[in-house]
């Protein structure tokens, strides 16, 4: 955690605010909403898993639409060839989720639930009431089922041309590196350069970019930042 704080402290260099809360032991994903109750306040909230990689030309527009949710929850789905390895969802014609299953033995759908979730403010109270599973943690699938029970769970899709990669294993981590490297080398642009994103959104200016260049030192990333200004 200290390494993350050193790399991205409070977000001032990006024109945003960043806070850190540490989960002292594994208690499951929904526990994050309990720990972050004061931080969340009366707002709605999104959760993204740190080992998930998302890429797509239309992804930004989808995310901006997802954060507008005011009542209920929404998940991002992606079609996979091995649904038995993932939590999957079956949806109706209106993208309402009608069935959820974690690593189903029988085919339900090939729509895997990715590690990107959007919730209304009820998520904090719902998370507090979850009971741990056999492995001793509260489960994200149980939280989603709570919303589904109330008919408040919908979905959107990454869609064709988009990518979702899980970097939870060494093999998948290197596959993701190769994917990013291939696209960046071909296009000449960085994927998810946070300083570039902040600059394009006018959250920061040349002053902050120059500070980042000094922080990173003499490297290719600094050279890329120099070309932005």
Name the predicted role of every residue range.
Residues 14-17, 41-45, 50, 69-73, ...:
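Short coil/turn connectors at secondary-structure junctions
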Residues 199-229:
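Generic C-terminus detector
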Residues 89-91:
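A structural signal for short hydrophobic beta-strand segments in well-ordered beta-sheet cores
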């Amino acid at each position: 955690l200290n390494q993350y704080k050193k790399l991205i402290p409070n977000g001032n260099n990006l024109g945003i605010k960043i806070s850190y809360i540490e989960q002292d032991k594994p208690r499951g994903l929904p526990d994050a909403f309990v720990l972050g109750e004061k931080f969340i306040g009366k707002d709605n909230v999104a959760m993204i898993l740190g080992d998930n990689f998302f890429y797509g030309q239309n992804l930004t527009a989808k995310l901006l639409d997802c954060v507008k949710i005011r009542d209920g929850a929404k998940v991002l789905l992606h079609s996979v060839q091995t649904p038995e390895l993932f939590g999957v969802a079956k949806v109706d014609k209106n993208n309402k989720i009608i069935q959820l299953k974690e690593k189903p033995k029988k085919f339900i759908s090939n729509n895997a639930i990715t590690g990107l979730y959007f919730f209304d403010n009820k998520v904090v109270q719902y998370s507090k009431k979850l009971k741990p599973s056999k492995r001793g943690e509260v489960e994200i699938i149980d939280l989603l089922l709570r919303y589904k029970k109330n008919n408040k769970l919908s979905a959107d899709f990454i869609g064709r041309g988009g990518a979702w990669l899980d970097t939870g294993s060494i093999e998948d981590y290197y596959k993701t590196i190769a994917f990013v490297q291939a696209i960046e080398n071909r296009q000449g642009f960085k994927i998810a350069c946070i300083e570039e994103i902040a600059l394009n959104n006018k959250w920061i200016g040349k002053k902050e970019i120059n500070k980042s260049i000094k922080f990173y030192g003499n490297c290719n990333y600094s050279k890329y930042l120099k070309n932005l200004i």
